[in-house]
Amino acid sequence: MIRALEGNRAMVRSGLLGIIALAFLQGAALAQMHGQHASEAACEEPTLRCATKVTPAFGPDGTLWLAWMAGGQVSVASSPDAGRSFSAPTQVTTKRLNLDWGPDARPKIVVDRKGGIALAFSIFRDEAFNGQVLYTRSSDGGKSFAELRPITANNESQRFEALALDQDGTVFAAWLDKRNRVPAKEAGRRYEGAGLFFASSRDGSATYAEAKLARDNTCECCRLGLTFAAPGRPAVIFRNIFEGGVRDHAVMTFADVSTPGEIHRVSNDDWQINACPHHGPSLTVAPNGTYHVAWYTNGKARKGLFYAHSRDEGRTFSAPMALGQPGRNPTRPYVLASAVGTVMVWKEFDGEKTSVQMTISRDDGETWSPPKTISSTTDTSDHPLLVSNGQQVYLSWMTKADGFRLTAIEDQP
């Protein structure tokens, strides 16, 4: 067993040394984004076969739902047999759109107890990567979807949306939003990053309440980790901008769906960077209330993938535990707590193939099983995700060579 001991585009605003140091990061981030976009463009059909980003969710009856982006469109399909067969897909979009194809972008989907489906995704509105978050819903079991609507009337850039479903059917949305940059500039103030905004829906994602600011000056370009810590209390992990331009992760737990809480730093990684990592964190809350988080950093204090947990609602966290083999470029961590244990997965590359590594904790994050390869590919692939039907945890992974895979996480000794 392993004990938990360790752990939009780049924008350079000032300084010649900063420009030189960030040139490589900027090129790498844009190359990754354009490379993924080119891969998507090579397969023009809106089918699952052509998908580059696939997001899973289980319905209350055990039906698996997938939402994916392919051919400039967003589609959904369902499977009654854990991914062995799928229904004919339903296109959510009615025409080809300039979908957000950044490394951390994907459609988001949740399915409520009545079978209602809430969906959200973002599009690019211009060549400067300014985005807009759109949402829709289905009330007929995925046969059709309502007309797409913007999640906020504001026209400033919105990206990196996340959805979470409460026990009472409330849908909670959070995203990164740049509406405060223009007022700041007009007032002569420097504005960094973006604002963490949120809104909730009590009618199954038919309408959302007015958007509110939870936290300003957060990192503008990493996915959010969002869940409910308890009924009526969303919790979100995000890359914050701390003093000195340090972009480390923070957790916020809401008092209710309308009231943001204080932020608490997950770890002092000391990653001082004036650029966009495009490598977001993961958050899950166990049935007993323990917060489990996984993240990537390239800070002065530590570099790579790390895990930590909190037993006081995210106020303090355990010492970071390192994940993966540094020589194999571990990336894209995802963690999910279930009634039978907490599972973590991430990707590694050995020079020839990409593998998904998995580890399980049976004691609430104190110790972890030795990492095990549970899937691999020699071609491009999506981020590994975890999904549960309440009884079984699965790895959800889309690969170019083998298509969509749903792999049951088997019990470990």
Describe each PLM feature range:
Residues 15-27:
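Bacterial N-terminal signal peptides
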Residues 32-413:
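Extracellular, repeat-based ectodomains that mediate carbohydrate processing or recognition
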Residues 1-12:
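N-terminal secretory signal peptides that target proteins for export/translocation
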Residues 10, 29-32:
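Residue-level detector of intrinsically disordered terminal segments
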